[in-house]
């Protein structure tokens, strides 16, 4: 749930963040079995989960100059649970720049994150440096 949390917190509290990235996030939980089950059980219904759905939140407006997502092509949850295509479509609709790197052969494991974490650290570092440069 780390990627999903990163996206939804950043999209809801965009003034507190300079950038956002995620590894294999659940992008549209109100439309997939994991999210439907969780929102019905914990919030009383799927509609209550829309404030916790990155795709629904992104449908409202462009927030960041870019969002970075890495996704493994061999992730067993890709087709039925993660829905990066829904997030990409929402981004397109509001003009939000989004990079979704489909990493060939990688699954949903720690090895996947370890292989690409440096890219995410560099991404955030560059965004923070650019932001600080506008303040100075």
Annotate each predicted stretch with a short phrase.
Residues 1-136:
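Non-catalytic cap/lid and distal C-terminal segments of serine-dependent acyl enzymes
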């Amino acid at each position: 749930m780390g990627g999903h949390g990163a996206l939804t917190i950043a999209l809801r509290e965009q003034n507190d963040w300079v950038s956002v990235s995620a590894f294999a996030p659940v992008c549209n939980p109100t439309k997939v079995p994991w999210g439907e089950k969780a929102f019905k059980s914990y919030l009383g219904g799927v509609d209550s989960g829309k404030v916790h759905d990155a795709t629904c939140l992104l449908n409202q407006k462009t927030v960041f100059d870019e969002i970075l997502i890495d996704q493994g092509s061999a992730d067993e949850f890709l087709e039925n649970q993660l829905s990066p295509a829904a997030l990409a479509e929402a981004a397109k609709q509001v003009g939000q720049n989004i990079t979704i790197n489909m990493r060939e052969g990688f699954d949903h494991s720690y090895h996947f994150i370890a292989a690409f974490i440096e890219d995410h650290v560099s991404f955030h570092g560059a965004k923070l440096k650019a932001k600080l440069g506008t303040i100075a």
